[in-house]
Amino acid sequence: MPKYYCDYCKSYLTHDTMSVRKSHLQGRNHIKFYCDYYEAKAKETNIWNPSSIPYEITLEKLNRYSDAKKSNGSSEDNMDIDKKENSSDHNKGNVVNHSDAGNDNDDDDDEMIFLPPPPNLSGLPLPTAAVYNNQKEYQKAILRQTLTKS
């Protein structure tokens, strides 16, 4: 059986089976070489503009999360840190109470436009009501987040 050659990593894999290829393609080094390759191609064609990257993640933010996690010694999610920082900025040091999250007024439903639920496939049961409610909550959260940033 012939060996598989990866153009990005410039190496041969020991076997040419789907499981070996799949594990290689999901590997950290392959992904890094893949990203580096297309970044270099973008720079060659002058379409690479680091200032137009849509992500707002900086090294300061990443280091702050790792420092906070080390100092806390807890395994709380990084998004919880954002919530605490945002609440301390707006509420002068108050901690976010997650039980209050569901008590929002539904008056803002008039301002929002919701897509209708997708049609169900014939022969399959309808999805539960929680699917629609969760989608509505996600859309509200996204709208709130975009309105507070602008």
Curated annotation (Swiss-Prot):
InterPro entries: Matrin/U1-C_Znf_C2H2, Matrin/U1-like-C_Znf_C2H2, U1-CZ_Znf_C2H2, U1_snRNP-C, Znf_C2H2_sf
Predominant subcellular localization, coarse grouping: nucleus
Pfam family, one: zf-U1
Domain of life: Eukaryota
Localization: Nucleus
Cytoplasm among keywords: no
Biased composition (Basic and acidic residues): 80-92
GO CC annotations, alphabetized: commitment complex; U1 snRNP; U2-type prespliceosome
Alphabetized GO MF terms: mRNA binding; pre-mRNA 5'-splice site binding; U1 snRNA binding; zinc ion binding
Any one GO BP annotation for this protein: mRNA 5'-splice site recognition
Skewed-composition ranges (Acidic residues): 103-112
ZnF bounds (Matrin-type): 4-36
Assigned keywords, A-Z: Metal-binding, Nucleus, Ribonucleoprotein, RNA-binding, Zinc, Zinc-finger
Start and end residues of each stretch annotated as Disordered: 66-127
Subunit structure: U1 snRNP is composed of the 7 core Sm proteins B/B', D1, D2, D3, E, F and G that assemble in a heptameric protein ring on the Sm site of the small nuclear RNA to form the core snRNP, and at least 3 U1 snRNP-specific proteins U1-70K, U1-A and U1-C. U1-C interacts with U1 snRNA and the 5' splice-site region of the pre-mRNA.
HAMAP family found in the cross-reference section: U1_C
Function, as annotated: Component of the spliceosomal U1 snRNP, which is essential for recognition of the pre-mRNA 5' splice-site and the subsequent assembly of the spliceosome. U1-C is directly involved in initial 5' splice-site recognition for both constitutive and regulated alternative splicing. The interaction with the 5' splice-site seems to precede base-pairing between the pre-mRNA and the U1 snRNA. Stimulates commitment or early (E) complex formation by stabilizing the base pairing of the 5' end of the U1 snRNA and the 5' splice-site region.
Entry's family note: Belongs to the U1 small nuclear ribonucleoprotein C family.
The protein's name in its UniProt record: U1 small nuclear ribonucleoprotein C
Organism field: Candida albicans (strain WO-1) (Yeast)
